[in-house]
């Protein structure tokens, strides 16, 4: 066995010219952007607007938020349950602006009208239920309801014609299933412990006003890689580190035209996921040096963090190990051992709910490492087999997998099928066949797939599932499905300015554009490579 530093990267002798060009352009673009290609967040921008109205660009942010209110009065993307938190966030921010009179250049009448419509939307939304498993929604939503109701108690709000009826009427009820007291209980636990745990930093805005001066300044200036958490810290925190935090917030605003994403930078996540996606059809030779450099920079023997200020996690650690192996420079998967939880991996230490996709990535990482270093012992092979069996047990009765990091089951199912496809045995093959059957049954007439409507990103995942199922290779049904899907992917790749909708979970939905585009480019190349 040759040294691991001399393993060849998985390149293919022949790629289509368009794939080589598109992959090279994408890798170059990502390499030149230290922040990450993700649209700004309505939720996050509204939180910064509320907590830091003094920050340059305040009226720009207000105008942008007003423009994004739907005809129904709500804000946000996706189905109704996903719109609760963005609507709470913007409604509170606009009420705060009205109370503090911080936007002389924005019509108070327009602000009040938007609040009126937002409150009406919230009255209808609150009883919906079925809330998504997004980051700390059980803390963030109740806190915002309390803040909104406090605003409605104030005389300066009651004096506004559009809002007087709300001020004199009933207050917003807590959304179905949420507890008004939970933010207080979380804050009390932090006070007893003498500090705020790292896992709460990213969503610190939900407890900040209950924990003044409880979090010291953080290296890099952004608390938990979150502009909202940082703005909340600036409003409630100590004097030390304030200049650094303001500088960091200002830099994010400059990158995103005065607005804010929910996590920044996302370069670790973006570069790892893009590397693995582009490796499926084989890395173009021109991309290998850059991807190798990314993997070397990101890999950390103590575990990889998705962004500065976040906890190390299985997902990013596994993807760093996997990307290293796929780029021909395998690195030891031992950092994953910190996340072992019996027969699977916790996504991070102290996790409340498990993740099938993080475990799928861990399985891929272990499999890739063992393919390079099969003599590394029985322990890793046993851990790999445990993870495989746990993953098989998570498959649902319809053949799909579902996960908390993504709204679409096509993502989770593709990750699990891809991880399992390198393993033999009737149980594994049956699971993959069941997943592919589910995919075939769900294709739309236009050739796309999607949980809420067809998207190119989800179509790429569905294509990978079908291509990984040996029982569907060459069947008329799969062949026709892939032919239709190829048209969908080609249109997304070659149409100018294609926008991938928000499907990923953070505090609300978000859309990592470059990552989704890599999936689409790679899936299209796999389909085109099948033709003689």
Swiss-Prot record:
EC no.? 5.5.1.12
Q: Which reaction(s) are listed as its catalytic activity?
A: (2E,6E,10E)-geranylgeranyl diphosphate = (+)-copalyl diphosphate
**Which terms in the Gene Ontology molecular function aspect does this entry carry?**
copalyl diphosphate synthase activity; magnesium ion binding; terpene synthase activity
Sequence motif: QXXDGSW motif, positions: 443-449
**Needed co-factor(s):** Mg(2+)
Keywords, alphabetical: Isomerase, Magnesium, Metal-binding
What name appears for this protein in its UniProt entry? Answer: Copalyl diphosphate synthase
Q: Which Gene Ontology BP annotations are present?
A: diterpenoid biosynthetic process
